[in-house]
């Protein structure tokens, strides 16, 4: 069956050419809708691709990691494990803290996940320890997601406990209410409390125990219902002085009588106003501070959330005393806005470059204005559809629009060039517009739908990568569709009204020079093409070699996942020996902070020491380093990290791990480095056997750097081995022993002070200043059956052992996470393969499993689907072209151009030192759509010449190549210049945009040269093949 062109009647463009007012108003409506839509589009760094994630934190001061695991974490995990839609569950149990992170499937709404988590916590309540100070608290937040904003609250006139109290009640609560905020944490929070430090010798001399004191305090401070009196005429509410509010009141509390004389709490203890947890501390630029970290909910718009916080900050700070200073240390939206601004500038630059190349070729202002109108109209009209689809203005959608500048102008160029050709031959503009638009209409439709077909596989990519690029693909597809509509409606109408034979022939010296140059180039191309057609097998050999080279380059090119961005914020972990105390860690962080703040690129620094939901152990500290803006420093973030690590390396007893924050966060736990690999077993003993072996093996690999693990099993522990028979004979139970130890060393929260604004705790502990270390255990006394006191040493033997500092689970089983970076000269693909090879070499047993986590796991998934993604794009394009041409052969001819694009893109990436990451892969997929345009324009005209003019296939393709050479060159250069600003970008977020530009520019340069010669040769080869098939199988002879 023969494909007939629309003819000279104008085809689908006829109505719009003949009704210019209606066409103008229709385009004005598209423009207006786009302008209005733009005003409603939110701004973000990337599309919303967050997994629904919820963190559950349970604090149990004084509990060991083993107790936290068995008594708190395990019961919660059993209930959470029954929830539907749960993708992954990880937990970390350390001294006094249990953190369970729940990651759900992408398709599950966060609110539904929240309901399931709340129900699971309720079901586990009866299984948890009865003396938990607070029930488990959940937050709709991913702990690995860096804070969107960090504020430091300092004062040179008030104690930190008072500052913390004001910040918690007046500032943090209000910020928590902002839409999009998932969690506000107060790092180093010195919450006010009454601290009771018992003098062990004093209570022993009086025959008392710490349990006697605890019972007296809890009985003296209550706040419960008392009822009311309801008389015949009046009702009276009952109240009492059952609450004690200050340290002075507790100091005067009578806890016992000795020989008729009262023993007050102040006689046997130091009672003072202090902090609830004395092992927490935070610093901002080395000054003690309350550091407020604001994290967003998964899926919340970071810009809108930060703007809302900024708007309320002045009002919140006014409620604080003048001596309290609130400083915004970091705001991730600053870099996001700068990145978006840079991308917007590159978009405008791309438009300007495209219009410039149009003028260079057409050398006519009216002819330049026409596609110059089509470009912004197509891009602006896209905004209206983006609003409807709940998209945002982000780096990826702006990159799509930047690339689209080269795409959307193609259709207009093809139409203008064809109409101009008829006007130059002497036809009237209206007739030329009708004839030229009708002739080219099928080509426009072919170009449009075949290009959109390339994007279809992107829409069906699964998991987070598919969600990430859905907005990119749809935005680009919408721009291309609008461009096709504009090119078939507005462009021919404007050509009929604005172009004339006189205007096209009007030339100045520059125009004549350009014309002579183009004539010489076309003539040279014609001579070269004639030689190529005379030596087809040599050309086919080049095409085949190109295919082989593409495969070879694909194999050898370094592969990565997502470009490492320079967002101006570095997250760090400071690691010390496992037996380090809070005091020693505080000293170490001061030394490290001093070195870091000396770096010229560093603007501010916050550090935190202590155990809470973010920091698992006392021997580690968290750091956040805020760099100066990119234009105010000389080095990129990786260079700064290297310099800082070198500066800190000379400090004994510490290891500093640093990594830049990223806009794309896939992990569910804060890691020391960028990539993670887990080793999981059914028991801790199995882990303890294999972790050192695997860690040593990984540390020896050149493809990995800064290898570390969270396995810490050498923490000092005092094992109290109770002689149960002796204890039973004295009437002492194990509960008595645990209570005595907890009272002395657990910073036990024994009572609550209620106020109108907040609640504060009474903390009980032994004053160990005079008896540090294990000697403090000798001061513990217990009450025996006869009422006397017995030293702990009488019934127990104290042993010093090693114990884990934290116990980690993944889906309820023990796990260790190895963290690593990739050194310069290697790629993530190299590192992954090296780890897999090492795993095979070690021959791990069946009950030991390994798995990559976070971005490394996503890299594996993306790498595995990349080849199929490209194959799917090619198949989709073949189907679309086959349907349009009603031919099995012609689509193959068109698709034969694709290897040239791959060679150019891969070579350009290798030369530029870039990895083949998912951004570059998107560029290659787009190249598939661009490069085949050349072949479509050639083949369309060759088929028309054969059909309408009776030309031979050789003459037809030769003429088509010469006639379409100029529009092919124009459209290719337009696409190249559209991608050029991305390739040359140097501003904020350039790391994200550059791979796309490099791949496209390299692919276009190589393919432009090769396809102009290989396509006509392959066209003739398949024509002869078609004739051969028809002669051998006449029953199946095609009509096309």
UniProtKB/Swiss-Prot annotation:
Membrane-crossing residue ranges in chain numbering: 25-45, 347-367, 369-389, 396-416, 440-460, 472-492, 537-557, 863-883, 888-908, 910-930, 968-988, 998-1018
Membrane topology: Multi-pass membrane protein
MF term (GO), any: xenobiotic transmembrane transporter activity
InterPro entries: AcrB_DN_DC_subdom, Acrflvin-R, Multidrug-R_MdtB
Subunit architecture: Part of a tripartite efflux system composed of MdtA, MdtB and MdtC. MdtB forms a heteromultimer with MdtC.
HAMAP family, per database record: MdtB
Family according to the record: Belongs to the resistance-nodulation-cell division (RND) (TC 2.A.6) family. MdtB subfamily.
The protein's name in its UniProt record: Multidrug resistance protein MdtB
Gene name of the encoded protein: mdtB
């Amino acid at each position: 069956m023969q494909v007939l062109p629309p003819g000279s009647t104008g085809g689908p463009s006829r109505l719009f050419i003949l009704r210019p007012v209606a066409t103008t108003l229709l385009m004005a409506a598209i423009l207006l809708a786009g302008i209005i839509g733009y005003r409603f589009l939110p701004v973000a760094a990337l599309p919303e691709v967050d997994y629904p994630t919820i963190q559950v934190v349970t604090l149990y001061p004084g509990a060991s990691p083993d107790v936290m695991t068995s008594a708190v974490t395990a019961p919660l995990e059993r209930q959470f494990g029954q929830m539907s839609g749960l993708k992954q569950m990880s937990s970390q149990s350390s001294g006094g803290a249990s953190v369970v992170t729940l990651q759900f499937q992408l398709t599950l709404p966060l609110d539904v996940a929240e309901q399931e988590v709340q129900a699971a916590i309720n079901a586990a309540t009866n299984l948890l320890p009865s003396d938990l100070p607070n029930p488990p608290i959940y937050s709709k937040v991913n702990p690995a997601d860096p804070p969107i904003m960090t504020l430091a609250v300092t004062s040179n006139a008030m104690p930190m406990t008072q500052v913390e109290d004001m910040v918690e009640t007046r500032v943090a609560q209000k910020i928590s209410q902002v839409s999009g905020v998932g969690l506000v944490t107060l790092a180093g929070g010195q919450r006010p409390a009454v601290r009771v430090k018992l003098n062990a010798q004093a209570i022993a001399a009086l025959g008392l125990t710490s349990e006697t004191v605890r019972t007296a305090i809890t009985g003296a401070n209550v706040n419960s219902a008392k009822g009311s009196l309801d008389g015949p005429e009046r009702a009276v509410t009952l109240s009492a002085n059952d609450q004690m509010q200050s340290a002075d009141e507790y100091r005067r509390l009578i806890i016992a009588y000795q020989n008729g004389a009262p023993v007050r709490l102040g006689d046997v203890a130091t009672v003072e106003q202090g902090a609830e947890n004395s092992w927490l501390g935070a610093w901002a630029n080395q000054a003690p501070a309350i550091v407020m970290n604001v994290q967003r909910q998964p899926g919340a718009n970071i810009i809108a959330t930060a703007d809302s916080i900024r708007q309320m900050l002045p009002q919140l700070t006014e409620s604080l005393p003048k001596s309290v200073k609130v400083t915004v240390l970091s705001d991730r939206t600053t870099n996001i806005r700068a990145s978006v601004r840079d991308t917007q500038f590159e978009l405008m630059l791309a438009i300007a470059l495209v219009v410039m190349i149009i003028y260079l070729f057409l050398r006519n202002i009216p002819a330049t204005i026409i596609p110059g109108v089509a470009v912004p109209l197509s891009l602006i009209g896209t905004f209206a559809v983006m609003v409807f689809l709940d998209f945002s203005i982000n780096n990826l959608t702006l990159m799509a629009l930047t690339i689209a500048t080269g795409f959307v102008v193609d259709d207009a160029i093809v139409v203008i060039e064809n109409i101009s050709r008829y006007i130059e031959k002497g036809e009237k503009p209206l007739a030329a517009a009708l004839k030229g638009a009708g002739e080219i209409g099928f080509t426009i439709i072919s170009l449009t739908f075949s290009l959109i077909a390339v994007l279809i596989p992107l829409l069906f990519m699964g998991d987070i990568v598919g969600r990430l690029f859905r907005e990119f693909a749809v935005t680009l597809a919408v721009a291309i569709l609008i461009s096709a509509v504009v090119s078939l409606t507005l462009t021919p109408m404007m050509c009929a009204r604005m172009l004339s034979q006189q205007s096209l022939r009007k030339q100045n010296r520059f125009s004549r020079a350009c014309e002579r140059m183009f004539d010489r180039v076309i003539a040279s191309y014609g001579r070269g093409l004639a030689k190529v057609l005379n030596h087809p097998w040599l050309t086919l050999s080049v095409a085949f070699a190109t295919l082989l080279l593409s495969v070879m380059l694909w194999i050898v090119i370094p592969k990565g996942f997502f470009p490492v961005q320079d967002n101006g914020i570095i997250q760090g972990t400071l690691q010390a020996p496992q037996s380090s105390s809070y005091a020693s860690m505080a000293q170490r962080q001061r030394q490290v902070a001093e070195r870091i703040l000396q770096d010229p690129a560093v603007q501010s620094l916050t550090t935190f020491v202590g155990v809470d939901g973010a920091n698992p152990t006392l021997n580690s500290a968290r750091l956040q380093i805020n760099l100066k803006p990119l234009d105010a420093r000389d080095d990129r973030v990786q260079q700064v990290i290297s310099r800082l690590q070198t500066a800190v390396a000379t400090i004994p007893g510490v290891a500093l791990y640093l990594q830049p924050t990223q806009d794309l966060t896939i992990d569910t736990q804060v890691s020391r480095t960028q990539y993670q690999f887990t080793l999981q077993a059914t028991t801790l003993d199995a882990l303890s056997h294999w972790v050192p072996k695997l860690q040593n093996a990984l540390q020896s690999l050149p493809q990995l750097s800064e290898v570390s693990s969270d396995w810490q099993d050498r923490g000092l522990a005092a094992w109290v081995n109770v002689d149960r028979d002796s204890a039973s004979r004295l009437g002492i139970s194990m509960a008595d022993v645990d209570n005595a130890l907890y009272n002395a060393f657990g910073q036990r929260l024994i009572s609550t002070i209620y106020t109108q604004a907040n609640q504060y705790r009474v903390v009980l502990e032994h004053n160990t200043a005079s008896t540090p270390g294990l000697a403090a255990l000798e001061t513990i006394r217990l009450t025996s059956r006869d009422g006397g006191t017995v030293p702990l040493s009488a019934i127990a033997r104290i042993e010093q052992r090693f114990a884990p500092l934290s116990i980690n689970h993944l889906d309820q089983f023990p796990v260790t996470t190895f963290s690593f970076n990739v050194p310069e000269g290697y790629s993530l693909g190299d590192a992954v393969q090296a780890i897999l090879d090492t795993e095979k070499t070690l021959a791990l047993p069946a009950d030991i499993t390994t798995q990559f986590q976070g971005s490394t796991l996503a890299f594996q998934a993306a790498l595995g689907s990349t080849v199929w993604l490209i194959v799917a794009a090619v198949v989709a394009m073949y189907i679309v072209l086959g349907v349009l041409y009603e031919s099995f052969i012609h689509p193959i001819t068109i698709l034969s151009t694709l290897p040239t694009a791959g060679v150019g893109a891969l070579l350009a990436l290798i030369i530029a030192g870039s990895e083949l990451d998912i951004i570059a892969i998107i560029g290659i997929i787009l190249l598939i759509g661009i490069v085949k345009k050349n072949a479509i324009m050639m083949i369309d005209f060759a088929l028309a010449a054969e059909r309408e003019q009776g030309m031979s296939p050789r003459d037809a393709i030769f003429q088509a190549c010469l006639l379409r050479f100029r529009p092919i060159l124009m459209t290719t250069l337009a696409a190249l210049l559209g991608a050029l600003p991305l390739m040359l970008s140097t501003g904020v977020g350039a790391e994200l945009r550059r791979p796309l530009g490099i791949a496209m520019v390299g692919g276009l340069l190589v393919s432009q040269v090769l396809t102009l010669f290989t396509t006509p040769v392959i066209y003739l080869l398949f024509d002869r093949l078609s004739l051969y098939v028809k002669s051998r199988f006449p029953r199946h002879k095609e009509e096309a």
